[in-house]
């Protein structure tokens, strides 16, 4: 049986549940059941690569087989094919859990992928699910709490999720209820399915070594040439999903790389909103873009301080390395490093606290609701409709060309730009790079694309060095205030060296821009 599943999932903590219990949606009659699910795939993970998951779960005394599709681009709805196994296929001589019933998959997208292939268990999910129903704006919503564990090989990962699933009515009611719940606890949408998490854990379990961790599910550029709106949905939805996963990881581990990846995801979302603006801009577009930028800005201070800490830890020029031979300089450096670490911890605490405020989770939900509603597809603007029907290559090529012209026009004046203007140029370079990565597939020019991206990366890195140098005096003085008299000597040296190194950094950036000018665009 084919169904369409529409749901919102949230990662929660025990403290969140205590706060949420005051809401009527979690205060009514409930049922509880233990659900043990086994997920199957071919040895080469053909279903995973196709964005499908095949599950066997024990429900009400019988096995139910469910094939789920991935999330549609920019949509919370997922197709699923359910089949109750009356006479489950079993391996001869074995009385353990059944194997998937292949005949029930005959008319599904999985059929050609598993034909002639052996199916084996990839991972299992064991949760206790508490369920209740709630009415919101005329819709019936199932409110479920899953508490349990995900297992793959020798690895385990805890599960504690709140799930809102629309059983009937308007999907907008899901967001109305979610925003109401977010007033009580910092709900953060989880756009990665349990199956995706299971596959990541299974990949980690297949690795060796003591530091195995679930792998990040890397974004891959569009492999085909989808329609313009589908491409936008895929890029924006993935960027938002990466943002939510990176925040959960940042809360748990407070890693600098995670902080960086979260900022990258938000910048990529902003780049997609601007790049596809002529096709999707509506009355909410500016508000959605502002919400994404607000989330990114909450991380800026912590990232800036981390980059400064890395510079000081590694040394900042020959003068600093020579000064470390003197005892006074070594003590000054140690005091300064301690101060910068305290500054970084405080900035990260402030950022995480800001994400725990209702405004942050509501901002993410506003973006998600806008993507799900896709009101731009119902526009009466003839020009916008025409842009939406263009092939991706026809839509994106002039946009890439315009971005490139702007980058080079400003880059030609690099030496006369202020630090803030150079930073704006770097943001333009990033937008061009993200667009080139995400939308290069329709042009089928891998060599030219690679050379163009390499040139862009060099410009971005060179401008990044300039940005770091410009920020050094301010950060050095702040660190000196935090460190006290011990850190003043080295802070002054750091500020002076940053100023002295700027001319050489400017020359490197100018050379990188000249190389970009000669890099042949892949879209012409």
PLM region spans:
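Cationic, histidine-enriched alpha-helical/coil surfaces that engage anionic ligands
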Residues: 1-524
